[in-house]
């Protein structure tokens, strides 16, 4: 017999969704119609809709098609940042993306996890912070509690489970700093 008890998992325990069920349902419908579609709705429209639902979004933000934002009221994006196609932001806790950042195609920013040491596997969520000028490469995973430092580069396909320092090129599984971003070749 297994010690894991998924039947005892309580999705409401330890999680504040931040808005009422009707607001969440309205966001879900809008997200399906405007954000998850391959149709290239203008970034300005998407940013305005995010603001209507409580997100903080700076000027000049570019948002490509098929971006999946779980809870917009727990999202802040700085000026002139770029959110690539099929980026998934699972923000059960706040996600802060600084100014002039690039979150590349299919990157996954995930604030949620489970405590696997307990049989009922309760939520264990922490915020994510992507500082100014950072670049999260395509198909990278950024996990709960991570800060990506100012002007850091996370190479494509990296698994980031610990904070990464400023102005470094970081890569791998697990992601580690490899070299200075601005060093001469």
Residue ranges and their predicted role:
Residues 1-55, 59, 100, 133, ...:
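Terminal amphipathic alpha-helical/low-complexity segments used for targeting or macromolecular assembly
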Residues 38-47, 66-77, 82-147, 173-174, ...:
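Flexible, glycine/small-residue-enriched loop-and-beta-strand segment within the central core
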Residues 58-59, 98-99, 149-150, 158, ...:
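Secondary-structure boundary/capping motif
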Residues 62-64:
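Conserved short histidine dyad/triad with adjacent acidic residue
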Residues 135, 155, 170:
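Short glycine/serine/threonine-biased micro-segments
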Residues 138-153, 158-162:
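Beta-rich strand-turn-strand
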Residues 166, 171-174:
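Acidic, glycine-centered active-site loop in nucleotide-sugar glycosyltransferases
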């Amino acid at each position: 017999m297994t010690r894991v008890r998924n039947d005892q998992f309580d999705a409401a325990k330890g999680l504040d969704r931040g808005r009422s069920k009707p607001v969440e349902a309205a966001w879900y419908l809008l997200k399906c119609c405007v954000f998850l579609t391959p149709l290239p709705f203008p970034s300005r429209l998407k940013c305005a809709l995010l603001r209507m639902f409580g997100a903080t979004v700076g000027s000049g933000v570019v948002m490509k098609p098929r971006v999946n934002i779980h809870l917009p009221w727990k999202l802040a994006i700085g000026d002139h940042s770029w959110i690539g196609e099929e980026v998934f932001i699972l923000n059960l806790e706040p996600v802060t993306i600084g100014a002039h950042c690039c979150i590349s195609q299919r990157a996954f920013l995930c604030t949620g996890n489970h405590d696997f040491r307990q049989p009922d596997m309760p939520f264990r969520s922490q915020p994510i912070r992507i500082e100014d000028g950072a670049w999260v490469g395509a198909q990278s995973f950024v996990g709960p509690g991570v800060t990506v430092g100012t002007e850091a580069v996370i190479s494509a396909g990296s698994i980031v489970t610990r904070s990464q320092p400023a102005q470094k090129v970081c890569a791998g599984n697990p992601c580690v700093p490899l070299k200075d971003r601005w060093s001469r070749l």
